[in-house]
Amino acid sequence: HRDTHSISLVGVKNISSTDIEKWAHIDHSSAELTEPSSPVSIESRSEHEFKTREIIQAIKHGHVYQVNYGRRWKAPLENDSWSVFSKLSRANPAPYSSWMRSPSLKWSVVSASPEQLLRIKDGIIRTSPIKGTTPRGKDPVEDAAKIDSLIRSKKDLAEHMMLVDLERHDLSSVCEPGSVVWSDFRIASHPNVHHLVSTVEGLVAQGSELSSAISSLFPGGSITGCPKTMSMSIIDHLEGTSRGAWTGSMGHINSTTGIADLNILIRTLDVRIKDSKNIGSVMAGGGIVHDSIPSVEVEEAEWKADAITRATWGAPAFKDNLSPPTAEMGVLALPMSPSNDKNANFTLFQKIPKIILVDNLDSFTF
């Protein structure tokens, strides 16, 4: 907990407190860091570019609008997952960071997630999707230019608004009719990247179950695509293997108070024990649309993964061993209505008597 600097343990009834203390002591003890291995990308840059072009072709043929493709880095892990989490939290603090260890499953998850899947409190359900990312600049002037470029990017804004519409639709299935609104639009600045972030929220409908709310939003639209079912089919075909923890969710649910808060597991390290060795896996990617540039998509995946690979193995996710720029965190509110700036990309369309109906099966219809 950020305010109390404490960690809550979630367990089962009738478990001895001494067992919990023993477990916590073993796992939270500070281990001496050892010389790490270097992560290996499971696919080459050229393979990543090829798969990006495959997705673009699927979009041009009308099968899908957007697909979030992920690439994997993998290597043995000499340090325990808690040490990695501690280092990552210092180097790349994030609002929805989380850590989990299951000895029986031989599995640990370390995450510095900046993204919220859902929050339910006082009868209001909220989701805060991220879509649109740029690396930080090397100085304040370049950093401001990066933000300006992101705000004016037609591609990023189009992707983001498509996602906002998708989340509004998904929330509508568990909210009171007419209560779902796009309530906030902002730039969230993290140590290594700037993100375009929105908040979509609504009043939970009478009789709606928490499980229904989770089902309506999971998996998040930002890490699948649109429409979801077709996007996930393409992802399954091109990625070829399970994502593991990446793009899953971790958080807390209080059945007594009805409060829930769940993240989306991006910027995440997945650790599995195989043959008595810890094997770490990191995935990163981005949303592919019709005008995506394959080489740019490859670079985006690499600098998204970079903070995790450096904290885990002390090595970059890309060939050039250059330290990416870092800066202070912050939030910049963005306008949610048409702007007087002629160069801005927010356009108010005139009302017309004709409409086009597009049925996207499992996502949204407009």
Where are these predicted regions, by residue range?
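Phosphate-coordination loops involved in phosphoryl transfer and adenosine-cofactor binding
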Residues: 352
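Two-component His->Asp phosphorelay active-site signatures
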Residues: 361
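Extended alpha-helical targeting/anchoring segments
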Residues: 1-346
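Localized chelating/binding microdomains
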Residues: 349
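Conserved hydrophobic helix-helix packing surfaces used for dimerization/oligomerization
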Residues: 355-356
